């Protein structure tokens, strides 16, 4: 395992020189001490190494080693996410049941999206291994190019899923902090003077009446914001698919043009191979004919016939 991480480190250093700022941005976005984010960092590192499609990656993709490593990293990440979510649930405290259910549902949905896309990535790598083994009328370069395109697309999707989950957990954590603060305030009220207790009780009654309205407004705002984010993500995915389709069409056209050019060159070479011997044979025959005529003239010179005299 240490050797694998050493290879990953060298690959990452090489990738940073080649890809520049986008990789640095990914690293900066995940500087955190939460265990689930650290597990996700390990998943990112391994995915970056797979994306290099180096000779070692190609060799390990032929076996089940890559998918096994991804499975372990995926399970570690999702286990840490579940543990962190459970920890926040225990800290959530006395919040409205509607708010608790909404926050839990949002976190669960974001967690499910991340897990499903990780599973899709693992299945795609398994499909690549099968395609390489069968090679059904395709070249290895075509299969590798298609895998590289799919990995880039999946990496973007996974990054969006991870960012969305991070936001949802941050909201969940904020609710837990508010619940803890309310618990501390309740203890302070019970230990305070009786007059202060009455004043705080009156203030809490007013806040309790306004709380459902605030919860409904927040829920509506969250639903609208979530819908806008979903529409934006769908639009970005569609644009990305169109761009990738255009790139595939352009690549296929270039490949077909190259094939036509090669076929024309082959046909030209065949024509040349057919006609050159024929021309050479005709030239030899013509030269032989000329030589025979010249030889005949030399051995049988033409004598001039005298003209008859006129009377």
From Swiss-Prot:
Transmembrane segments: none annotated. Residues 258-311 are annotated as: Homooligomerization. Coiled coil: none annotated. The modification Methionine sulfoxide is found at residue 135. InterPro entries: ApoA_E, Apolipoprotein_A1/A4/E. Heparin binds at residues 154-157, 221-228. The modification Phosphoserine is found at residue 139. One of its GO terms (biological process) is melanosome organization. Residues 202-282 are annotated as: Lipid-binding and lipoprotein association. It is found in: Secreted; Secreted, Extracellular space; Secreted, Extracellular space, Extracellular matrix; Extracellular vesicle. GO terms for cellular component: chylomicron; extracellular exosome; high-density lipoprotein particle; low-density lipoprotein particle; multivesicular body, internal vesicle; very-low-density lipoprotein particle. GO terms for molecular function: cholesterol transfer activity; heparin binding; phosphatidylcholine-sterol O-acyltransferase activator activity; phospholipid binding. Belongs to the apolipoprotein A1/A4/E family. Homotetramer. May interact with ABCA1; functionally associated with ABCA1 in the biogenesis of HDLs. May interact with APP/A4 amyloid-beta peptide; the interaction is extremely stable in vitro but its physiological significance is unclear. May interact with MAPT. May interact with MAP2. In the cerebrospinal fluid, interacts with secreted SORL1. Interacts with PMEL; this allows the loading of PMEL luminal fragment on ILVs to induce fibril nucleation. APOE is an apolipoprotein, a protein associating with lipid particles, that mainly functions in lipoprotein-mediated lipid transport between organs via the plasma and interstitial fluids. APOE is a core component of plasma lipoproteins and is involved in their production, conversion and clearance. Apolipoproteins are amphipathic molecules that interact both with lipids of the lipoprotein particle core and the aqueous environment of the plasma. This is Apolipoprotein E. It comes from Mastomys coucha.
């Amino acid at each position: 395992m240490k050797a694998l991480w050493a290879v990953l480190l060298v690959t990452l250093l090489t990738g940073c020189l080649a890809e520049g700022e986008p990789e640095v941005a990914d690293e900066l976005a995940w500087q955190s001490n939460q265990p689930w984010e650290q597990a996700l960092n390990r998943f990112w590192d391994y995915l970056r190494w797979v994306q290099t499609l180096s000779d070692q990656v190609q060799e390990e993709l032929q076996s089940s080693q890559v998918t096994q490593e991804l499975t372990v990293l995926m399970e570690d990440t999702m286990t840490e996410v579940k543990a962190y979510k459970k920890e926040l649930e225990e800290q959530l405290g006395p919040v409205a049941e509607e708010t608790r259910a909404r926050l839990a549902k949002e976190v669960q949905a974001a967690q499910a999206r991340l897990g499903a896309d990780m599973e899709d990535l693992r299945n795609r790598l398994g499909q690549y291994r099968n395609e390489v083994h069968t090679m059904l009328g395709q070249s290895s370069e075509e299969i590798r190019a298609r895998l590289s395109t799919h990995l880039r697309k999946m990496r973007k999707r996974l990054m969006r899923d991870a960012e969305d989950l991070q936001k949802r957990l941050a909201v969940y954590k904020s609710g837990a902090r508010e619940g803890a603060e309310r618990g501390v305030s309740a203890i302070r009220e019970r230990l305070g003077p009786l007059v202060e207790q009455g004043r705080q009780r009156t203030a809490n009654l007013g806040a309790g009446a306004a709380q459902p309205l605030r919860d409904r407004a927040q829920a509506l705002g969250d639903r609208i914001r979530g819908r806008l984010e979903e529409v934006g993500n769908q639009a970005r995915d569609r644009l990305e698919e169109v761009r990738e389709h255009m790139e595939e069409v352009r690549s296929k056209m270039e490949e077909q043009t190259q094939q036509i050019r090669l076929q024309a060159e082959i046909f030209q070479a065949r024509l040349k191979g057919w006609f050159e011997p024929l021309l050479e044979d005709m030239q030899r025959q013509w030269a032989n004919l000329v030589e025979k005529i010249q030889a005949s003239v030399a051995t049988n010179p033409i004598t001039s016939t005298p003209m008859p005299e006129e009377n």
